[in-house]
Each structure stands twice: as C-alpha cells, then as structure tokens.
C-alpha cells in the first residue's frame, strides 16, 4: 500500500534543508545523502545528489522527469554481471 495523499511525499528534513540553502545562495554542488527513501520534489531539479548504494555514493543529476520518484531508484544496489555463456564442452554433452 502506498503513502496516504494527505500526508504528502516524504523528504528527509536534513536533505530538504540543504537543498533550500543552496537554492537561496544560487549554488550548485554535490550533496551526499544516505536517504534513498526520499521522494524527488521540484525544488531538487538541477541539483546533483550523491545517493549511497551500500558501497559508494552514486551521483544523480535531478531532472523534471524524475519528480515523484525516489532517490534510491536511480542508484542500483546490485550489479548484474550477466548469465554464463555456454562453452563448446557443455553444448557437446547435450
């Protein structure tokens, strides 16, 4: 079940405070965050936010198309290396 509409989107208060400070100053710099659950709001557009994926911070440039999604959606936690390629020996056995 999703979040109630009357509550509004969740944004980490510390992250929102940093975004608002940068907007007031007119600065653009990378903001590190561990809050993958925060929803992207229009105030964040144009900023680069480094989202932690469990190992390192992945820089994510926020665009208008991302509004309403969560930060964690753009920093994958698992790396898919691909399936095993069948070798000649395995195909000969079949």
Curated annotation (Swiss-Prot):
Gene Ontology MF terms: rRNA binding; structural constituent of ribosome
Keyword line: Ribonucleoprotein, Ribosomal protein, RNA-binding, rRNA-binding
InterPro entries in the record: Ribosomal_uS19, Ribosomal_uS19_bac-type, Ribosomal_uS19_CS, Ribosomal_uS19_SF
A single Gene Ontology CC term: small ribosomal subunit
SUPFAM superfamilies: Ribosomal protein S19
Tagged with keyword Isomerase: no
Domain of life of the native organism: Bacteria
Matching Gene3D superfamilies: 30s Ribosomal Protein S19, Chain A
Biological processes per GO annotation: ribosomal small subunit assembly; translation
One of the Pfam families matching this protein, by short name: Ribosomal_S19
Matching HAMAP family: Ribosomal_uS19
Family recorded in the similarity comment: Belongs to the universal ribosomal protein uS19 family.
Function field: Protein S19 forms a complex with S13 that binds strongly to the 16S ribosomal RNA.
Protein name as annotated: Small ribosomal subunit protein uS19
Naturally occurring in which organism (per UniProt): Dictyoglomus thermophilum (strain ATCC 35947 / DSM 3960 / H-6-12)
């Amino acid at each position: 079940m999703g979040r109630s509409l009357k509550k509004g989107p969740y944004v980490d208060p510390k992250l929102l405070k940093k975004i608002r400070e940068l907007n007031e100053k007119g600065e653009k710099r990378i903001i590190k965050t561990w809050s993958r659950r925060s929803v992207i709001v229009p105030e964040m557009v144009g900023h680069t936010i480094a989202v932690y994926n469990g190992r390192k911070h992945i820089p994510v440039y926020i665009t208008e198309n991302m509004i309403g999604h969560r930060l964690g959606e753009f920093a994958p936690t698992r790396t898919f290396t691909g399936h095993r390629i069948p070798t000649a020996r395995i195909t000969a056995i079949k």
